[in-house]
């Protein structure tokens, strides 16, 4: 198992100095991935339900501060040497598909082949409407098409795609990514996401803290991973070739956080407890663990990074 840091696009990483410091230190400490989230605007009023909080509210919905995901990945590419750059996750319908493919390929070239695309279909209908995305109700089908178009553009000498949401032919798309094709990890925890991961993903990359589809135990994660692999088999694919990551936000190394029943929340507690959680997911099939401990204070974020890399990772 290797490890990554989800930086987000706000807080301590929401400015040049903070993003540079955290990205470079994660690189120096030998972490494998830097993750960046994807929002462009928030509307002042919204009926959409954020899937990763019990009350359905996004933590920044009131003020909406967020840097652009792909711009942050480009910046991080310029100030790091080895760490991979992960869209964690990209809301696939947010941007026009050919432009998105070009931006990701360009970052891959400028980083010498360090891009991994985490891909999701999104949850904030009002944001998609502002951006002119395909209708919210067809975001899954549109995302599937966009992904097929990305791969055509990245790998084919004369790329073409004809579909309900993406149409192009007779185009020259250069440069191609440095990698044969940019790996695409499908995000999401529900049945549709598991099906998408198994059938068209290069990997699966769920979050553990989804109240509707919780993966906050290694056993729950293992059961859902088995479902992803079944979907791969049904699609005629080798299920063991799928890459498997997991995103554990809310990391606390120190006093454990307790849920309403008094049970310790996963990935909180002593270094040994957090490492034990990580080993559980590793044994269940996860190859990559990305943790999140966003802070508004740079010194605090750097301290948390040091503790995780030096006190937890060696125990896994």
Name what the model sees in each region.
Residues 1-316:
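Active-site-adjacent structural elements that line small-molecule/cofactor binding pockets in enzymes
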């Amino acid at each position: 198992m290797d490890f990554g840091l989800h930086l987000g696009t706000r807080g301590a990483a929401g400015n040049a100095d903070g993003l540079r410091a955290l990205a470079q230190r994660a690189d120096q400490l030998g972490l494998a991935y830097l993750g960046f989230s994807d929002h462009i605007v928030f509307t002042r009023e919204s009926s959409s339900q954020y899937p990763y909080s019990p009350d359905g509210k996004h933590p920044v919905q009131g003020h909406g501060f967020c840097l652009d995901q792909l711009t942050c990945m480009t910046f991080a590419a310029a100030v790091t040497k080895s760490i991979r750059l992960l869209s964690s996750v990209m809301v696939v319908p947010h941007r026009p598909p050919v432009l998105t493919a070009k931006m990701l390929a360009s970052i891959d070239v400028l980083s010498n082949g360090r891009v991994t695309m985490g891909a999701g279909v999104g949850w904030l209908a009002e944001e998609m409407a502002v951006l002119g995305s395909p209708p919210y109700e067809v975001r899954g089908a549109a995302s599937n098409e966009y992904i097929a178009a990305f791969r055509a553009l990245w790998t084919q000498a004369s790329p073409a795609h004809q579909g309900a949401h993406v149409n192009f032919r007779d185009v020259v798309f250069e440069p191609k990514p440095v990698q044969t094709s940019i790996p695409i990890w499908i995000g999401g925890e529900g049945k549709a996401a598991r099906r998408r991961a198994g059938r068209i993903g290069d990997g699966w990359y769920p979050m553990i803290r989804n109240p509707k589809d919780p993966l906050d135990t290694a056993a729950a994660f293992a059961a859902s991973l088995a479902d992803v692999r079944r979907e791969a088999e049904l699609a005629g694919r080798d299920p063991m070739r799928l890459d498997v990551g997991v995103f554990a936000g809310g990391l606390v190394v120190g006093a454990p956080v307790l849920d309403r029943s008094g049970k310790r929340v996963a990935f909180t507690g002593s270094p040994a407890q957090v490492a034990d959680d990580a080993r559980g997911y590793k044994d269940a099939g996860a190859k990559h663990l990305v943790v999140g401990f966003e802070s508004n204070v740079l010194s605090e974020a750097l301290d948390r990074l040091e503790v995780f890399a030096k006190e937890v990772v060696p125990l896994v």
